[in-house]
């Protein structure tokens, strides 16, 4: 794509890619980072999200430095953490994990944190952390079992996908919706634009939804 700097998304998440496309930004490459996302003992949710976003950016930068076509690109990484109080919920991959998450979230408030980390062409690191407060309705056991049967929760922070069936569980949300999906668009585009990335470059060719 001529006319703008190269842009790399350090993620394999279809949701983050879709959100970027929604904002008219199309990555030149995806560089998912193989990072251990296990929280450290006693680690707070904010600190965990920030640490993992930076680790993903570091890993992607090392990969990009070895690629002549991408060297000097903007690199964006992100990590989303769902927490009840100080308790970090897992990215559920097992049925028991998902059920435990949903029972914990049922009828309660929780917070979703997404940390974004941008590496500039000069290899400077810029980070932002965005918080959204979410309240779920009280979930019956039938709700939980039916949702688990959908499979929508697999690999999702907190064991749910707000852009899917679980959107019907939300009683109240305070803050960025796209943050809960996995990438806060306002903060992301503001950060990119502030570092000189032409965020409007793709708008003329954007497809209306």
UniProtKB/Swiss-Prot annotation:
Gene3D superfamilies attached to this UniProt entry: 3.90.950.10
Cross-referenced CDD domains: Maf
Localisation: Cytoplasm
The organism's place on the tree of life at top rank: Bacteria
GO process terms (BP): nucleotide metabolic process
Cellular component terms (Gene Ontology): cytoplasm
GO MF entries: dTTP diphosphatase activity; nucleoside triphosphate diphosphatase activity; UTP diphosphatase activity
Cofactor(s) needed: a divalent metal cation
Site (Important for substrate specificity): 15, 80, 163
The EC number(s) this enzyme carries: 3.6.1.9
Main location (coarse class): cytoplasm
Catalytic activity: dTTP + H2O = dTMP + diphosphate + H(+); UTP + H2O = UMP + diphosphate + H(+)
Active-site annotation: 79 (proton acceptor)
PANTHER family associated with the record: BIFUNCTIONAL DTTP/UTP PYROPHOSPHATASE/METHYLTRANSFERASE PROTEIN-RELATED, BIFUNCTIONAL DTTP_UTP PYROPHOSPHATASE_METHYLTRANSFERASE PROTEIN-RELATED
Record-stated family: Belongs to the Maf family. YhdE subfamily.
Name of the protein in question: dTTP/UTP pyrophosphatase
Provenance organism: Bradyrhizobium diazoefficiens (strain JCM 10833 / BCRC 13528 / IAM 13628 / NBRC 14792 / USDA 110)
High-level lineage: Bacteria, Pseudomonadati, Pseudomonadota, Alphaproteobacteria, Hyphomicrobiales
